[in-house]
Amino acid sequence: GGLPLLGRLLKRLRAPVAPAPAVSVLGWGNRVAGALLWGPGGLWEVRAGAVLLATGGFGRLFPVTTNPHGATGDGMALAWRAGAGLRDLEFVQFHPTALPNGALVSEACRGEGALLLNAHGERFMPRYDPLAELAPRDVVARAVFRERERTGGVYLDLRPIPHLEERFPTVVAQARALGLDPLRAPVPVAPAAHYAMGGVRTDAFGHTGIPGLFAAGEVASTGFHGANRLASNSLLEGLVVGWRAALRALEDL
């Protein structure tokens, strides 16, 4: 995802990174011209010809989420206070299978044969959709939620996957870190807040309509994903819109 990509970029650019949260964006006339940061010693200003917000979503507003701790919606608040528009904030995608600590269990596991069971040990997805475990995320997430409410729990049985430990070592390690052994028994799962389709209103070039202010990635709402993003399309959006926004920002200086 984004963190490994950022690490690669920073190595190539050899750019300094200030570990300081932004408090607000700064204006100059009718355009954005930098940001006010909270760093060592208090507040300090960083002046810039353009500001590109790439702060992620707001999954941490939910009790169970796959998002990192920084995903608190601050970028959207910064943009809104600067006069940018927000849209589609109600469209939050819930990943259907997360472990109790929010660790994501990939759809690829169900694609390889993992089965969803309710607390009675019954496979239930065929009752909700002809595609069963391979139904779209929103369908599976709603089914998991309903079965948890109805029976008291939902479990993912990973044992049908051949060579599970070799195919999905991260999933096995995350489960074992919680004291679970997916090679011996199904593991408890639940829907978790995963991705915000809504955010700062932008065009396909990341421009917010405020001169000098751009946004890319989950913080932005380009409209590309509709109400239910397809898996992995967010990475493509971040790469394409991030690149286009950088070029447009240079033109906008």
Predicted segments, located by residue:
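Feature captures the FAD/FMN-dependent oxidoreductase FAD-binding
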Residues: 1-47
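An anion/pyrophosphate-binding glycine-rich loop and adjacent beta-alpha core
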Residues: 78, 84-187, 248-250
